[in-house]
UniProtKB/Swiss-Prot annotation:
GO MF annotation list: DNA binding; DNA-binding transcription factor activity; DNA-binding transcription factor activity, RNA polymerase II-specific; protein dimerization activity; RNA polymerase II transcription regulatory region sequence-specific DNA binding; sequence-specific DNA binding
Name the record gives this protein: Pancreas transcription factor 1 subunit alpha
Biological-process GO terms, alphabetical: amacrine cell differentiation; animal organ morphogenesis; cell differentiation; developmental process; exocrine pancreas development; generation of neurons; hindbrain development; neuron development
Entry superkingdom: Eukaryota
């Protein structure tokens, strides 16, 4: 053994136990495992500092809060890191997948909450304004009686439904007249006459020198002849209900208007 180590100078400083002839070529696999805590102290301290710096930067950029170095600890027997922030503690395993920390929901400040409330109030006011404008347009298209105050939304919808039903009845009653399969011979014929007028030959006329005009003439009847023949015309007239009287009725389920009656003129 001494002959082998002769070329290597400076080995005298090592303990003789390292070069024991009995132990130098002995298989140490059968020996008990050595305690690794002494060998891992420096690595653990390095990793702890790196993890602390990482979470310190992350907390400052997000929440402005971070964990202290003293909250980190290492245990060689369990091979786990533990840390604690504020009042909470959790365990981090090297074999666990996913992030090391759950992102905490950022708490909104009082200024942000006030801005959100103001924005919600503005949206609600705009929504109510659009609804009121729509009801005003509906009131302007419905024939109503001269009321002392403006109609409510419920009364406006009730009158609108009745007026729509009345118009639907008028359309249905007018369908036979507009039916193309009806007898066309019984319909009064309209005479259309096409003529071409001539311009005045007088130079003093404003139309002098212009080309002749083309026009049409339609047949027409005199309204006075109808009166002389005692002809009576009838028409359907829709009378809106008075909302003030609806509250006096026992049943308010029927929101349609009463059937229209014939108006004799």
């Amino acid at each position: 053994m001494d002959t082998v180590l002769d070329p290597f100078t400076g080995l005298d400083s090592f303990s003789s136990s390292y070069f024991d002839d009995d132990d130098f070529f002995t298989d140490h696999s059968s020996r008990d495992h050595l305690d690794t805590d002494d060998f891992l102290d420096e690595d653990v301290d390095f990793l702890t500092n790196q993890i602390q710096e990482y979470y310190k930067d992350s907390r400052i950029s997000q929440d402005g809060d971070y964990c202290d170095v003293g909250n980190f600890s290492f245990s060689s027997s369990s091979s786990t890191f533990s840390y604690g922030c504020a009042d909470s503690t959790s365990e981090l395993s090297p074999h666990r997948d996913g992030g090391l920390l759950k992102r905490r929901r950022r708490m909104r400040s009082e200024v942000e909450m006030q801005q959100l409330r103001q924005a919600a109030n503005v949206r609600e006011r705009r929504r109510m304004q659009s609804i009121n404008d729509a009801f005003e347009g509906l009131r302007s298209h419905i024939p109503t009686l001269p009321y002392e105050k403006r109609l409510s939304k419920v009364d406006t919808l009730r009158l609108a439904i009745g007026y729509i039903n009345f118009l639907a009845e008028l359309v249905q009653s007018d369908m036979p007249i507009r039916n193309p399969h009806s007898d066309a011979l019984n319909q009064p014929k309209k005479v259309i006459i096409c003529h071409r007028g001539t311009r005045s030959p007088s130079p003093n006329d404003p139309d002098y020198g212009l080309p002749p005009l083309a026009g049409h003439s339609l047949s027409w009847t005199d309204e006075k002849q109808l009166k002389d023949q005692n002809i009576i015309r009838t028409a359907k007239v829709w009378t809106p209900e008075d909302p003030r009287k609806l509250h006096l009725k026992s049943s308010i389920n029927n929101i349609e208007n009463e059937p229209p009656f014939n108006f004799i003129s």
